Swiss-Prot record:
This is Kunitz-type serine protease inhibitor microlepidin-4. InterPro entries: Kunitz_BPTI (IPR002223), Kunitz_BPTI_sf (IPR036880), Prtase_inh_Kunz-CS (IPR020901), TFPI/VKTCI-like (IPR050098). Residues 1-24 form the signal peptide. It comes from Oxyuranus microlepidotus (Inland taipan). Belongs to the venom Kunitz-type family. Residues 31-81 form the BPTI/Kunitz inhibitor domain.
Length: 83
C-alpha cells in the first residue's frame, strides 16, 4: 500500500473513532441508575439517562438527594451518558 493510501486509512480510522458514539461499556455506571425523585418537594424538571430507552429523558425531581443520574439540562445528560 502506498504512503498516500496509508495516510488516508489513518485519517478515516481517526474520523471513525471521533464520530463513534459512547458505547455502553464506556458509559459511567451512574448512568445505569434509575431516576430518583428524592425526598424533597421542590419539584422541578430534570433529566436522567434511561438504559431501556437508550436516551436521556425528562423527569420530575424533588430538589434534593436522589442519585448521580440527574442532570439540570438535556445537554449535560447527553454529554455524560448518551450513546
Amino acid at each position: 500500500m502506498s504512503s498516500g493510501g496509508l495516510l488516508l486509512l489513518l485519517g478515516l480510522l481517526t474520523l471513525w473513532e471521533v464520530l463513534t458514539p459512547v458505547s455502553s461499556k464506556d458509559r459511567p455506571k451512574f448512568c445505569e441508575l434509575p431516576a430518583d425523585i428524592g425526598p424533597c418537594e421542590d419539584f422541578t424538571g430534570a433529566f436522567h439517562y434511561s438504559p431501556r430507552e437508550h436516551e436521556c429523558i425528562e423527569f420530575i425531581y424533588g430538589g434534593c438527594e436522589g442519585n448521580a443520574n440527574n442532570f439540570n439540562t438535556l445537554e449535560g445528560c447527553e454529554s455524560a451518558c448518551a450513546a
